Amino acid sequence: MITKKIRVYGIVQGVGFRPTVSRHAAAAGITGSVCNKGPYVEIFAQGEEKCVKNFLERLEKQPPKRAAILKINTEDVKEEEYGKFNDFQIIESEKTKGEIFVSPDIAICEECKKEMYDPKDRRYLHPFINCTCCGPRLTILDALPYDRERTSMKEFPMCPDCASEYEDPATRRYDAQPVCCNDCGPEVYLTGREERGRAAIIATRKMIHDGGIVAIKGIGGFHLCCDATNEEAVQRLRTLKNRPAKPFAVMARDVEAVKQECLVNEVQEEILDGHQKPILLLEKRKKSADSTGLCKSVAPGNPKVGIMLPYAPVQMLLFRYDDGIQMPDYLVMTSGNASGAPICRDDKEAVEELSQLCDLILSHDRKIRIRADDSVMDFYKGEPYMIRRSRGYAPLPTMVTMPWKGQVLAAGGELKNTFCIGVDGRFYLSPYVGDLEDLRTVKALQETIHRFETLLEVEPEVAACDLHPKYNSTVVAEELGLPVVKIQHHYAHILSCMAENDRKEQVIGVAFDGTGYGTDGTIWGGELLLADYHGFERMGSIEPFLQIGGDISAKEGWRIAVSLIYQQTQDKEQTMEIVKKLNLCSEPECKVILAMADRKMNAVTSTSAGRLFDAVSAILGIRTKSTFEGEASMALEFAAEAYEKELWEIDEPADGESDPDEEKKEPEDRLIMKIGSLIKYLTEKKTEGIQAEKLAYIFHQKLADLITDGCRKIRKKTKCNCVALSGGVFQNRLLLRMVEEGLEKEHFTVLRHHLIPANDGGIALGQAAYAMQYIQEGK
């Protein structure tokens, strides 16, 4: 007879871990106990040595489906120390300080789906069905350990039947904290109307069927929903949301419905129908003009559509119910928020912000503690490539194997904000918060930071934030009453890539994005950095240009196009002639831009790769303006991909090799990626009538060549052979592939993002990593 004390670390709360341990104990023939300590699960296993060994093997090989075991510590203990166990017991949770891991929300499982549609089951058509394998977790959590009294489900006492299941180790709902049924659980209702329960769901389905727009409260917030096959309904939603072109997310009935509209491989199907159920960016199928299905206005001008499957029971009931209403296979399911505001999470917010955007609001009385937007995932070389990390993924920690000790908070960026809490080598990136230009989103950030500090039981020693002095994220960090460390935007991008890849040594960082405040007070965005956790050196950048017009230049790429042409020609008349041929703008508009350039009026020096893409999109006549962030740049990428797909013959330009200024350095001896000759080539070929798609492809290839060449020169100088690629421009998969392949041909080790976004949604991780190193050095 032996006794072992076992501690299991990882995602072990809210995933049915203790019931699984109890079943394994029974199968192995051992006695003992299991207790949720908060940071870990503690198990005492007593029995014959072979039985205890069998139990441990089961634990390692057959953990709960949704668990993530990071480590298992075992030690032998003496029987007299803890006594003899007569049976195996699940002990009530205890609160212990230490490593904490919080489970994200989990999509409805197959077993619950079957029960929900079984007329004989007592949870038939129950909008809140769940079990130990699925249901809300993070979004209902007040504190740890994860028990019902510390969630928003504490307001719903279990009925005798649910309590019986909850207490029975033989059931799937043993110790399932959100367990409930139609008799004791939350209830759906229409705000401002009498319909509740079944009547509310039927009224919602009928409204969607008839072409209306509804707001629906889900797990992490509200969605705005309409029939995605109804052109009139989708266009009306676009008008109400003032969203003329930005793609809407779609929810499909099932996998087969997705395959009718999109190309889906095995990896994508597994993720699409997995327990996290993010929005996947999938390639549209080519369809005939008269085919039915998704209407064109869902994702206009985009070869992909963002699509997901229902992950909450109430969403499944929208597609299938027993009321005889024939519902479409596809619903628009876009975040329920007013422009610029965070996703709504309660009735007050929904009524105030969504009433003017929809015809009905379907809500429920289970409170959402933490907002969680849908995660968005692209694919690159057959692997997931995260665009927005939120529901289903946050707050799973990123582990960095550095000998760090301490607690830090990073406030993140101004756009696509997430924040990050670092505890030693574990970094908890929050769900998506949003753009902080709106004070409502700033308030949401402050509230969520406070709740996370409570959940993770941390008291940060320092707060990290962006270098920009006027960012709201900077203000949030400064108001925390902690020592503040400020990190340059693009340096934080590179550190986030290093942290995700657990890279400890120095890298050449290629940070390409739209904007970031530089250490010299100018706008950066096309940077080559030499970086590690101690600091960075700016080794190179895109050739600086004037960004004319302030913030509006980010929406009107033609302005930067005129500026770039003028910078290349150094002649007003010649510039105006080229602008006229390209039909970039009117003559008066051109004259204004040139005058502003001469006087440096409302003009800032910039090295922004994002704005360069916008300008080239305008020069090639693809997009001169953007109605949403990245629209012109995305259109340029799609044009280049279309060219590559057709395998047209490439006529290589005689680019910068003939530029006499190609090898010139700036005063601080910074490597400059010269773009003047490339702009000249593109304008000349476009006026000659060369296809825009072909020129878009050439632009991508030549920019990739400039990056590769720059990294090669930096390696020669520094002997650093590892390159990290980060920043929102690297969401452009064509550029990413061209750069990665170019670097690999030069025998570089290349790091890129995977499940941490390359965009500003990931920089909080880099900020937190720097702050942690800052603590170690006692700065």
Predicted region positions:
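Conserved phosphate-binding catalytic cores of ATP/NTP-utilizing and phosphoryl-transfer enzymes
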Residues: 259-264, 317, 343-348, 374-375, ...
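Glycine-rich phosphate-binding/hydrolytic loop that grips phosphoryl groups
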Residues: 491-512, 516-518, 557-566, 701, ...
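Intrinsically disordered, low-complexity, mixed-charge
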Residues: 1-178, 182, 189
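A contiguous, well-structured pocket-lining segment that forms one wall/lid of small-molecule binding clefts
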Residues: 178, 185-187, 413-451, 563-720, ...
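Short glycine-rich phosphate-binding loop at a beta-alpha junction
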Residues: 215, 457-469, 718-729
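Conserved phosphate-binding/catalytic loops in two-lobed NTP-binding clefts
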Residues: 466, 481-493, 721-724, 733, ...
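A phosphate-binding glycine/aspartate-rich beta-alpha loop in the early core of alpha/beta enzymes
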Residues: 76, 159, 221-286
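Internal gly/pro-rich beta-alpha loop/helix module
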Residues: 62, 165, 323, 327-402, ...
